[in-house]
Amino acid sequence: MTVLAIWSVSAVVSLPGLAISPILGDLNKVFPRATDLEIQMLTSLPSVLIIPFMLLAGRLSVTGNKFKLLVVGLAVFFLSGFACLFINQMWLLILVSCLTGIGAGIIIPLSTGYIVDYFTGDYRIRQLGYSSSINNLTLVLATMLASYLANVDWHLPFLVYTSVSYTHLTLPT
């Protein structure tokens, strides 16, 4: 059971920015007054914010409760994905995308940190490989789903964030 829980955290790591990609071409139609800079900020700011929050979460995970940190990261990730379903202003979409980056930054170091904490030797190395595989498989599947959902409505690709993080938040501890 521990292995499945740890693998599931790996599924979230590749998702930041994914929901924006399939709708980039339509954003000029959805937000006709949006500048190119604002649209570029949607993809770059979350990635930029991942870095400091990854470092902060890594530091906090050494001295604090990793589980609580994971729950906070997943909650921020879930809530930002959920909020995107209702946004109709570009500045709000940028702000909430930044929150997605913050949530992901908190989660990312924990995905491998848990493997290092719970496993040793060759088994640890194998688990790190599985984690990477799950990360990439999730990215492929979520990209296909987000692309399909983008054809229905531009808000719907953000469901990818909510579905994965909601699953984690509702699992028994």
Question: How would you label these PLM feature ranges?
Answer:
Residues 52-85:
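Conserved MFS/SLC helix-loop-helix module at the cytosolic interface between two early adjacent transmembrane helices
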Residues 91-99:
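Paired small-residue
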Residues 167-173:
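Conserved small/polar residues in nucleotide/adenosyl-binding loops
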